């Protein structure tokens, strides 16, 4: 990201005038899954999962020209910021289905350590432990299809926040339970048309970043500050969906409304919100503000919010030659407002998606055009994002290796129109556009 705000400081003008941010990611993950089938009348099977993940993201300053010639002092001034996340997860699902009911009980445990460190402690090491119990039920009640689920989470999150001025450390512990449930009823209206109505209530506690973050996040261009006093979110969602399929013609329409109490969002702070008490403006604080003056101050805050939107799709399948061709049109849109009437930030605009696909034996060709509309229904402090069209294509061939396995080869092209496109939901949409025209190939082998 280019930053020109330091040009007024003669001693920093040369150093920061052409500053850019570079990042690298290193992740190691090991996953083991299995299933044990039983002949018991009560317990049909047990699925089990173990996953261990080590993740590291390094964000560093670098000069566009001559960045290798800086002295040691300058190198220390721009020491990298390192995001780490080490997680271990265990899970098991017990199938206790009967002839009339599908029933499953799930247990899951996660132990996660996170930290964001650099020249200063941007987020001190934090620990997150979660134990989950879940129950799922599915039944055919003749007149309706019923799906229902319940989930209980026991969560403990511990962390600390270091005062940027005086270095004092405050320790925090969040220990709470959340309860969530969902239920849906489906009904066949005709042989080709069915309807589904669903309701879900989901509780979510703030993450360790939302609670304890306290420093610069270069990839978002923000000086982020969490809040250890954030409350949990409660989301109540109602949706209704219609599906039609007569073998050739198909259509889908889904509508939803989602009320979220205590919705947590990262909100940019503007000049009229950035006043600080003079008695705390010591030399260290001034240096801290000057060092990160090119970043936008942003706080994790919460307020009640409402999301409402829809998704539709229509299409038809034709026989063509020795294969089938499918054409379709889809559209989705969402509106989101806080309880005070202001728009929720970084909400993507409406999209129209045109698709064409052709399948013949082991060949698949797909062409899609995504028409993303202009987003001018924006939140406070946001800027309008222009519309764009994204044309993608891919051709896939599957080779059967004489019983030894299956080789899948895909040739693809994305953004074939080479549009200068920007994602409205991105914190750095102006500095980092979506990738331009590119081509590639993918290979996968299953045995």
Where are these regions (language model features)?
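Surface-exposed extracellular loop regions of Gram-negative outer-membrane beta-barrel proteins
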Residues: 54, 154-168, 173, 191-238, ...
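Face-selective signature of the C-terminal outer-membrane beta-barrel domain
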Residues: 25-188, 194-196, 200, 252-255, ...
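Outer membrane beta-barrel strand-and-loop segments of large Gram-negative receptors
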Residues: 75-93, 134, 225-231, 237, ...
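Outer-membrane beta-barrel "beta-signal"
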Residues: 241, 434-447
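Periplasmic-side early beta-strands and strand-to-turn transitions of outer-membrane beta-barrels
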Residues: 1-30, 40, 57
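Outer-membrane beta-barrel translocator domains and adjoining extracellular loop/strand segments
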Residues: 4, 18-20, 33, 49, ...
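Gram-negative outer-membrane beta-barrel transporters
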Residues: 141, 256-260, 283-378, 417
């Amino acid at each position: 990201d280019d930053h020109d705000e330091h040009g007024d400081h003669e001693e920093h003008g040369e150093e920061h005038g052409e500053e850019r941010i570079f990042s690298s990611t290193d992740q190691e993950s090991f996953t083991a899954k299995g299933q044990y089938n039983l002949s018991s009348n009560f317990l049909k099977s047990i699925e089990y999962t173990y996953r261990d993940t080590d993740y590291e993201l390094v964000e560093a300053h670098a000069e566009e020209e001559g960045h290798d010639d800086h002295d040691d002092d300058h190198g220390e001034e721009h020491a990298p910021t390192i995001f780490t996340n080490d997680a271990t997860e265990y899970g098991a699902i017990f199938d206790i289905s009967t002839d009339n009911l599908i029933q499953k009980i799930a247990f899951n445990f996660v132990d996660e350590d996170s930290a964001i460190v650099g020249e200063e402690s941007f987020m001190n090491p934090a620990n997150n432990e979660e134990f989950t119990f879940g129950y799922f039920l599915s039944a055919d009640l003749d007149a309706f299809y019923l799906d229902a689920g319940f989930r209980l989470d026991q969560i403990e999150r511990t962390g600390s926040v270091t005062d940027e001025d005086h270095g004092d450390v405050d320790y925090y512990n969040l220990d709470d339970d959340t309860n969530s449930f969902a239920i849906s009823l489906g009904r066949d209206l005709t042989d080709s048309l069915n309807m589904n109505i669903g309701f879900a209530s989901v509780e979510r506690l703030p993450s360790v970043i939302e609670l304890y973050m306290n420093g610069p996040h270069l990839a978002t261009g923000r000086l982020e500050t969490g809040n250890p006093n954030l409350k949990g979110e409660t989301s109540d969602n109602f949706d209704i969906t219609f599906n039609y399929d007569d073998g050739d013609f198909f259509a889908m329409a889904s509508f939803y409304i989602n009320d979220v109490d205590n919705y947590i969002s990262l909100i940019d702070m503007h000049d009229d919100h950035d006043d600080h008490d003079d008695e705390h403006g010591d030399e260290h604080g001034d240096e801290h503000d000057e060092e990160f003056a090119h970043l936008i101050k942003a706080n994790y805050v919460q307020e009640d919010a409402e999301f409402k939107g829809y998704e539709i799709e229509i299409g038809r399948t034709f026989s063509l030659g020795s294969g089938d061709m499918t054409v379709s049109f889809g559209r989705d849109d969402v509106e989101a407002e806080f309880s005070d009437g202001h728009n929720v930030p970084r909400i993507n605009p409406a999209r129209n998606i045109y698709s064409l696909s052709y399948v013949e034996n082991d060949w698949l060709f797909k062409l899609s055009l995504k028409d993303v509309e202009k987003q001018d229904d924006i939140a406070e402090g946001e800027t309008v994002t222009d519309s764009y069209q994204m044309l993608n294509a891919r051709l896939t061939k599957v080779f059967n290796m004489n019983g030894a396995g299956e080789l899948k080869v895909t040739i693809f092209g994305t953004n074939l129109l080479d549009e200068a496109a920007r994602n409205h939901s991105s914190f750095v949409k102006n500095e980092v556009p979506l990738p331009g025209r590119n081509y590639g190939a993918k290979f996968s082998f299953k045995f």
